[in-house]
């Protein structure tokens, strides 16, 4: 079987079994909004339900759930989102683990899965942005921007509007 098609095996933790799901088309945007707000994730606090819907339409949402025995549902305890142009670049977003589940390897499994997910395609590089989790990512081969081959630039939409470009 193709390695890319394999969903990570469930993992046993002191809290119970954590199972992994590709919920790109099944997770409710409201559930994501509640999860990210409950975990006090600063970069998602402003997202509306409609924005979550649009984000899910153009990327893959990989989740970790604390599942009761013999169940497919369960409490959302981890998530990451991956976007790809399917040829050159993919980007990791929203890597989050529930605070009471940190240190169990959930984020590691989610990131590894995102990096090998078949939906991403045959890209040449992965990128991500982080303010406070930079020490987590070198284990996967990520390096700080100044070690890359290009300058990372961005512009906010309000600046484009100010300049009459949008």
Language model: regions and residue ranges:
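Conserved acetyl-CoA-binding loop-helix of GNAT-fold acetyltransferases
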Residues: 97, 103-116
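Short amphipathic alpha-helix that is part of the acyltransferase structural core
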Residues: 2-47, 165-166
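A conserved beta-strand-loop-helix scaffold within acyl/acetyltransferase catalytic domains
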Residues: 50-96
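Acidic/histidine-enriched, glycine/proline-rich intrinsically disordered or flexible terminal extensions
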Residues: 158-166
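Short secondary-structure boundary/capping segments
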Residues: 9-11, 52-54, 118
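Conserved active-site alpha-helix within GNAT-family acetyltransferase domains
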Residues: 108, 119-157
């Amino acid at each position: 079987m193709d390695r890319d098609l394999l969903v990570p095996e469930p993992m046993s933790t002191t809290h119970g079994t954590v199972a992994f799901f590709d919920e790109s088309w099944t997770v409710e945007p409201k559930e994501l909004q509640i999860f990210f707000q409950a975990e006090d994730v600063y970069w998602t606090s402003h997202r509306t339900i409609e924005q979550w819907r649009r984000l899910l339409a153009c990327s893959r949402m990989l989740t970790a759930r604390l599942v009761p025995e013999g169940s497919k549902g369960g409490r959302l305890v981890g998530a990451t989102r991956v976007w790809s142009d399917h040829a050159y670049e993919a980007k990791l977003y929203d890597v989050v683990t529930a605070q009471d589940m940190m240190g169990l390897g959930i984020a590691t499994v989610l990131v590894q899965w995102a990096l090998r997910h078949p939906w991403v395609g045959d890209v040449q590089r992965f990128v991500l942005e982080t303010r406070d989790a930079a020490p987590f990512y070198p284990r996967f081969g990520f390096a700080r921007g100044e070690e890359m081959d290009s300058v990372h630039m961005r512009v906010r939409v309000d600046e484009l509007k100010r300049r009459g470009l949008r």
